[in-house]
Amino acid sequence: MSARAHEEKKRLRALARARASAEAPRRETHARRMIEHLLASPVWPADSASPVMAYLALDDEPDLDGLWLARSAATVAAPRIDWDRKAMDAAILRSIDDVETTRRVRQPRAHGPTVEPADLGLVLVPGLLFDPAGGRLGRGAGFYDRFLARLGPAAVTCGVCYSAQVVDRVPTEEHDARVGMILTEEGMRETSAP
């Protein structure tokens, strides 16, 4: 990555964090609306045959923990990071109480069952910024880019952010994974990602 591209992404990450921070007073309301939109959408599975990978929110991300309380028939997993391998797995999370914090990241406890990425039907992807073409600006570690490359061809990828974090264009590189949908408090929309 060029120095100019690196500086642009750094600037955009600061902008995105400021926009997310501005949404803090409405965070719970936005999260409830996002969960309602998601559970009512045709991409949410009606049974456990097509597992979903959600995420456990960081402080500035939309908090979708309510999915574990929704009593949905879907099997829901969450990212579990292996810091040594710089890899991420989808660990089944049966209860929001079965979570530990490692390096300030909430994740399912170690040694629980996992879902193969190729078996996931829907993956909810947090991000700092998204664009209508499915471009995503993450935190820069590449965990989601590497994980999404392992999904099966039928998997739906859905970026999750506040509507203020959807911008005209996110700078991307060849290795950056795109999402097929974006979920905000205003609803779900398809992107133009292939």
Regions picked out by a protein language model, each given a short descriptive name:
Residues 86-194:
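Conserved phosphate- and dinucleotide-binding cores of soluble alpha/beta proteins
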Residues 2-119:
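N-terminal active-site beta-alpha-beta segment that forms phosphate/nucleotide-binding
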